[in-house]
Amino acid sequence: MIQQETRLKVADNSGAREVLTIKVLGGSGRKTANIGDVIVCTVKQATPGGVVKKGEVVKAVIVRSKSGARRKDGSYIRFDENAAVIIRDDKSPRGTRIFGPVARELRDAQFMKIVSLAPEVL
């Protein structure tokens, strides 16, 4: 589960390396987010010359989570790290490449561009 103040690795080439969660979107009192949920973040580490700069406030979608997610068939998907992809307001990624596997739950959440760019969908 991702909550406020959680640090996540960035799984794209937008220029950010690490982000810190400011807010979980979707509901007035919502505390936690999981795979496929949109969060508001601030960039804590960034590469020089990237599209995104340090200190910038961005929206991101969670693509990998340590806590995992339960699927309809009863199985669970769990990853070794918490990772997110920085997105625009129209749900398209700001970077042009996605690094590492992403969960199949992103397809249900209408993030088809991220799913098509990912090297592996689990």
From Swiss-Prot:
Q: PROSITE patterns, from UniProt?
A: RIBOSOMAL_L14
Q: Which GO terms describe its cellular component?
A: cytosolic large ribosomal subunit
Which Pfam families did the record assign? Ribosomal_L14
Q: Which family, according to the similarity comment?
A: Belongs to the universal ribosomal protein uL14 family.
Print the organism lineage.
Bacteria, Bacillati, Bacillota, Bacilli, Bacillales
Key words, A-Z: Ribonucleoprotein, Ribosomal protein, RNA-binding, rRNA-binding
- At the top level of its lineage, which domain of life is listed? Bacteria
User: Quick check: keyword Glycosyltransferase in the entry?
Assistant: no
Biological processes annotated in GO? translation
Entries under CDD domains matching the protein: Ribosomal_uL14 (cd00337)
Q: Which GO terms describe its molecular function?
A: large ribosomal subunit rRNA binding; structural constituent of ribosome
Q: What does this protein do?
A: Binds to 23S rRNA. Forms part of two intersubunit bridges in the 70S ribosome.
How this chain assembles, per its entry, is:
Part of the 50S ribosomal subunit. Forms a cluster with proteins L3 and L19. In the 70S ribosome, L14 and L19 interact and together make contacts with the 16S rRNA in bridges B5 and B8.
What is the native source organism of this protein?
A: Oceanobacillus iheyensis (strain DSM 14371 / CIP 107618 / JCM 11309 / KCTC 3954 / HTE831)
Q: What SMART domains does UniProt report for this protein, alphabetically?
A: Ribosomal_L14
UniProt protein name? Large ribosomal subunit protein uL14
